[in-house]
Amino acid sequence: MTASVSNTQNKLNELLDAIRQEFLQVSQEANTYRLQNQKDYDFKMNQQLAEMQQIRNTVYELELTHRKMKDAYEEEIKHLKLGLEQRDHQIASLTVQQQRQQQQQQQVQQHLQQQQQQLAAASASVPVAQQPPATTSATATPAANTTTGSPSAFPVQASRPNLVGSQLPTTTLPVVSSNAQQQLPQQQLQQQQLQQQQPPPQVSVAPLSNTAINGSPTSKETTTLPSVKAPESTLKETEPENNNTSKINDTGSATTATTTTATETEIKPKEEDATPASLHQDHYLVPYNQRANHSKPIPPFLLDLDSQSVPDALKKQTNDYYILYNPALPREIDVELHKSLDHTSVVCCVKFSNDGEYLATGCNKTTQVYRVSDGSLVARLSDDSAANNHRNSITENNTTTSTDNNTMTTTTTTTITTTAMTSAAELAKDVENLNTSSSPSSDLYIRSVCFSPDGKFLATGAEDRLIRIWDIENRKIVMILQGHEQDIYSLDYFPSGDKLVSGSGDRTVRIWDLRTGQCSLTLSIEDGVTTVAVSPGDGKYIAAGSLDRAVRVWDSETGFLVERLDSENESGTGHKDSVYSVVFTRDGQSVVSGSLDRSVKLWNLQNANNKSDSKTPNSGTCEVTYIGHKDFVLSVATTQNDEYILSGSKDRGVLFWDKKSGNPLLMLQGHRNSVISVAVANGSPLGPEYNVFATGSGDCKARIWKYKKIAPN
């Protein structure tokens, strides 16, 4: 009995072991199959992603080649058109000159025939008077130059008769030579001249042969056609060198003087009438139908920024700043300096927290966080190892070498000049001569700062190609994002707070997943990226400006290019130089861009947001071009209600623009160097009465400003 039970137990254990072995075998096969499939899946996925990236790069290269070829063809066509226009102009000028010469020759021949007929009739009907005494002249025509037998010629021995009561002059008939005109009776010529005066005032007569009138002696006291007085320079240029040139007689000169005086009298009232109109040129407003045009004059009040010459009603002046108001518009904004924050170096960027309570600034090696209400320093963030790592990365990396003139050259990209790539900070650095105090590698400028939506974290981008995520309260780095191959110039958080977009000189825009610290999407373009922005609300779109003068808008989920806003649009209203700042309007329907071409532009994106109708402009069109800055535009921002646009420039000024009309409302001069960065605060950190904005400058200052709307005077 016991043996039977034992055998049964052993058999059961064997069966269980067999089942266990079978289960383990199946599990191993399943794991092997899963791993193999996972590897195949990952391999195929990576291969497809690589192919997509290759296709995208190929498309971008083709696009770049197309643009270059198009530019070359357009330049060649431009030169050819210019050549054709010049040739047509020359042909037209020659045709007009030939016609005038023919008309003048016909008129001279007619005058000669009429005078010959009159003289012939007079000599046939009136007895010959006593011959006047012969006159000797150095300009008399030699006998060898005369020809006998001409039907209309007079004998050499005969002289013109003296006619009693006749209006004919008693002077002898001159020979018409090169650059001289045939004589006519004075009173008759004066009448003809007054009736037939035509421009140009100095008539050029085609040369005639000395044998036109046979035997007619020449005299120094000759008479010519009176003509309208020409400018002295014209007379000097057209004065013939022939000694036989005729002179204008006293009567002709009197007629000329009278005509000239009358002409001047007619011109002077026109000039006097134009003077009052010029007084109103200071009141220039942009015509509504020219809002998008790039070629517009700068409003006159912005041309001369000397506050001493401006009336008190059109300015506000203190020891630290002054404001010039547009005289053509009512004064509706009052701006005051709230706090001035001194820094040890150039302030490259300023950015408010989402609630507007804090302001972050970036300068050399450090990032500061200030409380807006009182300007107190909340935190100073600095990575002590950053400068050393930055220096080592430059000296140890074989693919990157540092050269003079602040130029970085890499083996995989084209040469990028720091001054061209980062005029915002580098222009100020050049002015301050910062690179003379230390080697370029010892500087580590914080190019961009951005608060997380909840205000707990701060992202910073710098020259060492790293993005640091700081815990503001603990003043510690919680994450470092690596992947860019050149300086990082711009950052922006997504509204959800779990993603970040960055733009770099390595010609890429990258979207980072902050939950994993990995790059989730890379967008490549043909030139360096200078600025990026995320659309408000859902963060559906990202915009980027670059050195190729274009603003691109992508779908942040798919990476598809939605819009390309540049000078190649149908209207030709795009930027003419590199774009250095972009920002979405608060409603997300438009993009504002600032460029080195000294302009600010407002681009319509309503069709891209699927909210367009027949009354709205086409997607991607430039609605307004704001002209007023006299140097590079380095930063742009919009107010909370999108009523105004602010722009900072290398001309040291901040302009308030009326968004709809395109007119500048005021110019704020509050810095002694380039205004590199401008930011507008959300909320009301200084109370409901004031709105707040901040500026960062190459004068090593960041300033917090407050403004409010006032009732028009």
Curated annotation (Swiss-Prot):
Oligomeric form and interacting partners: Associates with CYC8/SSN6 to form the CYC8-TUP1 (or TUP1-SSN6) corepressor complex that is composed of 4 copies of TUP1 and one copy of CYC8. Interacts with histone H3, histone H4, MATALPHA2, RFX1, SKO1, PGD1, HDA1, HDA2, HOS1, HOS2 and RPD3.
SMART domains on file: WD40 (SM00320)
UniProt-recorded name of the protein: General transcriptional corepressor TUP1
Keywords tagged on the record: Nucleus, Phosphoprotein, Repeat, Repressor, Transcription, Transcription regulation, WD repeat
Record keyword Thylakoid present: no
Family (UniProt): Belongs to the WD repeat TUP1 family.
Protein purpose: Acts as a component of the CYC8-TUP1 corepressor complex which is involved in the repression of many genes in a wide variety of physiological processes including heme-regulated and catabolite repressed genes. May also be involved in the derepression of at least some target genes. The complex is recruited to target genes by interaction with DNA-bound transcriptional repressors, like MATALPHA2, MIG1, RFX1 and SKO1.
Residues that bear Phosphoserine: S439
Keyword Cell inner membrane: no
Segments annotated as WD repeats: 342-371, 441-471, 483-513, 524-555, 574-604, 628-658, 670-706
Region spans: Disordered: 124-278, 387-409
Highest classification ranks of the organism: Eukaryota, Fungi, Dikarya, Ascomycota, Saccharomycotina
Source species, domain of life: Eukaryota
GO BP: DNA damage response; hyperosmotic response; mitotic cell cycle; negative regulation of dipeptide transport; negative regulation of DNA-templated transcription; negative regulation of transcription by RNA polymerase II; positive regulation of transcription by RNA polymerase II; protein polyubiquitination
Additional remark text: Present with 5840 molecules/cell in log phase SD medium.
InterPro entries in UniProt: G-protein_beta_WD-40_rep (IPR020472), Tscrpt_rep_Tup1_N (IPR013890), WD40/YVTN_repeat-like_dom_sf (IPR015943), WD40_repeat_CS (IPR019775), WD40_repeat_dom_sf (IPR036322), WD40_rpt (IPR001680)
CDD domains: WD40 (cd00200)
Subcellular location as annotated: Nucleus
Any single GO CC term annotated in Swiss-Prot or TrEMBL for this entry: SCF ubiquitin ligase complex
Biased composition (Polar residues): 164-180, 207-226, 241-253
MF (Gene Ontology): histone binding; histone deacetylase binding; mediator complex binding; phosphatidylinositol-3,5-bisphosphate binding; transcription corepressor activity; ubiquitin-like ligase-substrate adaptor activity
PANTHER family registered for this protein in UniProt: F-BOX AND WD REPEAT DOMAIN CONTAINING 7, WD40 REPEAT PROTEIN
Comp. bias (Low complexity): 124-153, 181-197, 254-264, 392-409
